[in-house]
Amino acid sequence: MLGSYQVAMSIFGVMMTFVSSGIPVVLSRNVSYYSAKNDKKSIGSLVSSGLIITGLICIIVSGIILLFPNLLSIIFTSNASTEMIYILLPALIFSSIYEVLRGALWGRKKFFIISVTEFIEQVLRIILLFILFNTTFINISATNKTALSLSLACVISAIIVIIIYFNTKGNLSNPKYEFKNLLKESSPITAVRTASSIVSSIIAIIIPLRLQTFGYTANEALSEFGIIMGMTFPLLMIPSTLISSLAVTIIPSISEQSNNIDSGNLKDKSILKSKINFSIKSSLLFSSLLISTFIALGSPICKFIFGNEKSGIYLSYASIIMIPLGLSQITSSILNAIGLEMKSLKNYIISSAILILSIFFLPKYFGTYALIIGYFLMSLSSAIMNISMLSKRKLINLSFMKTILILVLINVASATLGIFIHNLLNINLILDIIVSTIFTLGSNILLMLCFNIANIKIIIFNRKKKFA
């Protein structure tokens, strides 16, 4: 049953990506730009257009599923997964409404409201799940109850966001002014995010098969793949959460200066450049913060969390991905914020091709580590191409390359200290991790402050003032 749930949720995730992943990003960007000009008519037109576009896509997707149920039978081997998709259709429809209005609120910098609504949605899911699992008159399977709780939570959350949107002076107006532009600008972003889901599926197929070709058994190949993707990579993604939060708060202020840099929509280039450089330096800080800790303590950390030391070995090697991954993430967001989504799509396609080629050819020489090398090359190539796009438009100060070099040296020094402390200690695993992390992470932060990598006070206390 759990397998059926995972399969159904994977397909639902792809559907959600296809329906509404690009619209909220472009909508928030343009709402931010028009808000700075106090152009309420264009904002209303954008929101109306977003609701119509996502609504039409939802109708088409839902119609295909309802009119051609045999399509799901081809995709799924279990009827349980098919039933879940039917139950999740209301979640698809109401989530699309939620995402559009959330994008509009994001563009208007209503960050606290967005956080509250997302928190409410999660609380609703827990409460509804508890009620459904303790209700006897609803005679459906546990997985279907889980799907139903998600659908109900999405419906209620959408209603709450609708009320909040109009109570905060949100408006709707004739969509004809922005419909075509919104559809055109959001398509590349939707393509990137849908392709990302597809690429993940391709990787899940290619890596085990290639490992089997070079001596692994089927079980060994799947096990190694599961260790890297299920244990190692989630820890590598910790800085990505911080960078995503940075993007949420700073991207609207970037879009205020220009929602399409190549068309000449630009208020103040010096301010725009300042914000872009701040974003990049902050992402470097977040990305490099845990590298030395993961290099020195990957094995004990993963042994404690997962009971698997091998995932920790992978983590130590894979930590080199974190800086190019963070750069790729923030620069992609910046390109989308200033109307260069087609450039971002092109860069993504090229970097994804590098990843797929790497995991196809490199397992012969590096085994499972080919996946780590592939993601490193993908992130590095994406970051270089994105930075090149910004550099050509004179929107970036390449002095951050010096910052990267200093951060690498700092992490080497901190990791060396961490390894020394870890080898010196002969104590309980948890205490070992705590003490070694204090020395490793502490020395990392101390060296960053000594080399003036980041002014912590400015980042924490003055960010609102700097980007108001």
Predicted region positions:
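Membrane-interface helix-capping segments at transmembrane helix termini in multi-pass transporters
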Residues: 2, 37-48, 60-88, 136-145, ...
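Helix-loop junctions and terminal segments of transmembrane helices
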Residues: 21-36, 236-267, 273-280
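Alpha-helical transmembrane segments of multi-pass membrane transport and lipid-handling proteins
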Residues: 48-75, 273-324, 356-357
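Membrane-interface junctions at transmembrane-helix termini in multi-pass inner-membrane proteins
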Residues: 94-116, 320-350
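Membrane-interface helix-loop junctions in multi-pass transport and translocation proteins
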Residues: 109-113, 123-159, 342, 351-384, ...
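Interhelical loop/hinge segments that connect adjacent transmembrane helices in multipass membrane
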Residues: 143-147, 162-194, 261-270, 392-408, ...
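Transmembrane helical elements of multi-pass membrane transporters/channels
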Residues: 149-157, 161, 176-252
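Membrane-proximal transmembrane or re-entrant/amphipathic helices at the cytosolic face
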Residues: 419-468
